[in-house]
């Protein structure tokens, strides 16, 4: 335990993320942090603060966030020193200007009690667990909707029933959304990536771009009419050729400059009015068996000669590494140092002498 506590105390000693107004949280006994629970930290926080969750084998639980803050973990892959990561339940949002990054969590949802338009919410570099509805606003019946939500760099791998739960649920009250650079495993047969629709009459209220969507079975991209989405520069790896990209009722939705491939046979271009790269294997740098199931050790970058290079919108690459966002498999927030090793400085330590250690870390992106 002392080894783990040492790593936890060092977690916040380096880098810009540990500037003023950082509230550290650890739910382990005798842990050197300011707060022992997420609820306690949220109660003490002020607008603009960073609530930093230290790695722990214990779940931090659900939380309702009512002030503009950042909830930050050290990434969604186990810390090499403590063997843990920050895991939480569902974040219920009742305020604008919220950022959730670098944690392992169940969902971010818009609270039904949110009485105004909730703007500028960022969900970045997280990994999601559970059945789905990982980012959801459409089931909140009394709120006024959302604007300028950004969902980037996340890993979404449903691992629980029911298998009809969508990955995202949005509503006609949501506008100016961007869902981009996410790894999405559409695992279940009746699961949809997008459920719901943007504002009636507002074309392309939702941008869905530079994502990698892997489907484990047959299904459809959306079960909504009037989705009002612009889907570009994505990489779709589809197991079943019967997969439906766009239901006939989905108006104002476009598929532009995507790569769509199935190893089982040819797919039909869902939007003949635009160019999509159809039925050409994407060719990744390092993916086991060429099938892009999620693995933290895989490299989902496009290999030289891939048909997806330069074929995204405006000449970008399709998939996770096109455009300007820097996707990383471990979900480490930009600028946050990460520890790689710790060792004693000397092989022999005299009796009653202090123990000196050497710590190595990456300085962050």
Q: Can you annotate each of these PLM segments?
A:
Residues 1-22:
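Bacterial Sec-dependent N-terminal signal peptides
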Residues 28-31, 49, 55-58, 75-78, ...:
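Acidic glycine-/aspartate-rich tracts in secreted/extracellular proteins
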Residues 274-333:
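C-terminal accessory segments
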Residues 318-355, 360-364:
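Short, compositionally biased P/S/T/A/G/V-rich stretches that sit at domain boundaries
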């Amino acid at each position: 335990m002392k080894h783990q506590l040492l790593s936890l105390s060092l977690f916040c000693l380096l880098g810009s993320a540990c500037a003023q107004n950082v509230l550290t949280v650890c739910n382990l006994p005798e842990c050197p942090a300011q707060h022992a629970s997420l609820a306690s930290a949220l109660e003490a926080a002020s607008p603009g603060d960073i609530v930093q969750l230290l790695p722990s084998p214990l779940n931090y639980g659900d939380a309702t966030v009512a002030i503009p803050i950042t909830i930050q973990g050290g990434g969604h892959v186990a810390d090499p020193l403590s063997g843990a990561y920050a895991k939480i339940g569902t974040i219920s949002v009742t305020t604008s200007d919220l950022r959730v990054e670098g944690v392992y969590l169940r969902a971010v949802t818009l609270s039904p009690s949110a009485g105004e338009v909730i703007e500028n919410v960022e969900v970045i570099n997280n990994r999601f667990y559970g059945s789905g509805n990982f980012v959801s606003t459409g089931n909140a019946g009394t709120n006024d909707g959302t604007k300028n939500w950004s969902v980037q760099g996340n890993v979404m791998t449903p691992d629980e029933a029911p298998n009809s739960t969508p990955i995202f649920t949005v509503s006609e009250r949501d506008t100016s959304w961007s869902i981009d650079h996410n790894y999405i495993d559409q695992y279940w047969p009746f699961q949809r990536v997008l459920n719901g629709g943007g504002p009636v009459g507002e074309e392309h209220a939702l941008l869905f771009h530079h994502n990698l969507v892997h489907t484990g079975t047959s299904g459809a991209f959306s079960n909504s009419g009037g989705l009002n989405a612009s889907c570009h520069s994505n990489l779709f790896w589809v197991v079943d050729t019967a997969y439906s990209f766009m239901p006939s009722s989905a108006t104002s939705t476009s598929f532009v400059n995507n790569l769509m491939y199935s190893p089982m046979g040819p797919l039909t271009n869902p939007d003949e009015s635009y160019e999509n790269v159809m039925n050409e294997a994407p060719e990744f740098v390092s993916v086991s068996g060429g099938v892009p199931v999620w693995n933290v050790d895989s490299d989902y970058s496009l290999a030289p000669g891939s048909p997806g290079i330069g074929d995204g919108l405006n000449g970008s690459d399709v998939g996770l590494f096109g455009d300007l966002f820097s996707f990383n498999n471990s979900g480490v927030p930009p600028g946050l140092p990460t520890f790689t090793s710790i060792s004693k400085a000397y092989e022999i330590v005299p009796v009653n002498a202090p123990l000196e250690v050497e710590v190595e870390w990456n300085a962050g992106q």
